[in-house]
């Protein structure tokens, strides 16, 4: 009899049993999982199907922190709350895998006090760009060579902002300067609106509309873009935060306006398998379960409709195109044979039943005569 039915605490699992999985028939709802977590405080619940002991958690934490021995800021720590509940906290690596553009917020929640006193040269200096480097990594903006800026614009540098272009943008085309087209990057990893030259009267109005986002001035030209695929970011989370809360934390970090409902977290394994994290999953603990090495598994932020890839399908992903074609042809042939086998089987069974019915009809006719 299973331990949740008897009320007795489960026997400790061996390391080879990690993570220990139980039937979904016994833990169907998150409420029941929470109740059991209070009933068995020595157990750590990953989701409604997976749990580990504190000893196993300690082993995972030790392995993880040894891997990042020289990077103390990446260590995952744990402690206990006042009521004795264990909590784990640390930095979680998340990779960008979205295919739709994201929208930055036009206003920060907290005011930027030194906005008026800061000069343009200070804001966009190389030192400043290094300090805010992670924000720039989101869409890989590099400083425009000042020799490309017309002298008339240099004189107005205190009134206007300096334009920045993606380092993956195509060379300037001979389009009209006021054309509000979207440039397409060479890697097709980002969308950046082509800079328009506004009238002098519009510049002050535009400056009023800009806000400070993570230390950056809001820029209409680069406020909508697609982050480069596989670009990495970090977000501080804890074991109380489930999948949707982690997504919210990431969007909040970069002041992204899109709804958390538009995204999902996926674990992509080295084998090519891609598994979506459920709402009840705790991403930080899932990271621990997969080990510290990103070569084995990585967590991606993806669009909500991104498809999962099973382990069966993943084994074919890295094969050569010609080999995949031959495999597909073989599967089609096998499918046809299987269909024919089933059709033949049921035709035989139907023939036997029809023969029995005919025999009964003959006997019934003879009896009535």
Curated annotation (Swiss-Prot):
Gene: RASSF6
Every SARAH domain range: 313-360
Top-level taxon of the source organism: Eukaryota
Stretch forming the signal peptide: none
Chain coiled-coil ranges: none
One Pfam family per UniProt: Nore1-SARAH
SUPFAM superfamilies per the UniProt record, alphabetical: Ubiquitin-like (SSF54236)
The name this protein goes by in its record: Ras association domain-containing protein 6
Keyword Iron: no
Tissues in which the protein is found: Highest expression in thymus, kidney and placenta. Also detected in colon, small intestine and lung. Tends to be down-regulated in 30-60% of tumors derived from breast, colon, kidney liver, rectum, pancreas, stomach and the thyroid gland compared to the normal counterpart.
Modified residues (Phosphoserine): 187
Domain Ras-associating stretches: 218-306
Organism field: Homo sapiens
Alphabetized UniProt keyword annotations: Apoptosis, Phosphoprotein
Phosphoprotein as UniProt keyword: yes
Spans through the membrane: none
Description of how the protein assembles with itself and partners: Interacts with MOAP1. Interaction with activated KRAS is still a matter of debate: interaction has been shown in the mouse, but not in human. Lack of interaction with MRAS, NRAS nor RRAS2 has also been reported.
Known function: Involved in the induction of apoptosis, through both caspase-dependent and caspase-independent pathways. May act as a Ras effector protein. May suppress the serum-induced basal levels of NF-kappa-B.
One GO term of the biological process aspect: apoptotic process
């Amino acid at each position: 009899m299973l331990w949740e039915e008897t009320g007795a605490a489960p026997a400790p699992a061996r390391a080879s049993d990690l993570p220990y999985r139980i039937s979904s028939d016994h833990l169907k709802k998150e409420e029941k999982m929470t109740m059991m977590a209070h009933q068995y405080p020595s157990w750590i619940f990953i989701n409604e199907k997976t749990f580990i002991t504190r000893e196993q958690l300690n082993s995972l934490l030790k392995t993880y922190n040894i891997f990042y021995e020289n990077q103390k800021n990446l260590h995952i720590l744990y402690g206990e709350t006042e009521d004795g509940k264990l909590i784990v906290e640390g930095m979680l690596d998340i990779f960008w895998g979205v295919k739709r553009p994201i929208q930055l917020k036009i206003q920060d929640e907290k005011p930027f006090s030194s906005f008026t006193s800061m000069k343009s040269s200070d804001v966009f200096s190389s030192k400043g760009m290094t300090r805010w480097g992670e924000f720039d990594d989101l869409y890989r903006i590099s400083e425009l060579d000042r020799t490309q800026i017309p002298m008339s614009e240099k004189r107005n540098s205190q009134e206007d902002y300096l334009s920045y272009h993606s380092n993956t943008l195509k060379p300037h085309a001979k389009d009209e300067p006021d054309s509000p087209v979207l440039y397409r990057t060479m890697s097709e990893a980002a969308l950046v609106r082509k800079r328009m030259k506004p009238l002098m009267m519009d510049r002050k109005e535009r400056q009023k509309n800009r806000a400070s986002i993570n230390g950056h001035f809001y820029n209409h030209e680069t406020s909508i873009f697609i982050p480069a695929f596989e670009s990495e970011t970090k977000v501080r989370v804890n074991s109380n935060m489930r999948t949707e809360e982690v997504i919210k934390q990431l969007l909040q970090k970069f002041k992204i306006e899109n709804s958390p409902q538009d995204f999902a977290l996926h674990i992509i394994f080295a084998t090519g398998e891609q598994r979506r994290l459920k709402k009840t999953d705790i991403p930080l603990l899932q990271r621990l379960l997969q080990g510290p090495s990103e070569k084995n598994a990585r967590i991606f932020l993806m669009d909500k409709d991104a498809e999962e890839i099973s382990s069966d399908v993943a084994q074919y992903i890295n094969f050569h195109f010609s080999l995949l074609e031959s495999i597909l042809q073989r599967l089609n042939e096998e499918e046809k044979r299987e269909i024919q086998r089933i059709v033949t089987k049921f035709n035989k069974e139907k023939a036997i039943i029809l023969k029995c019915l005919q025999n009964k009809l003959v006997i019934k006719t003879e009896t009535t005569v």
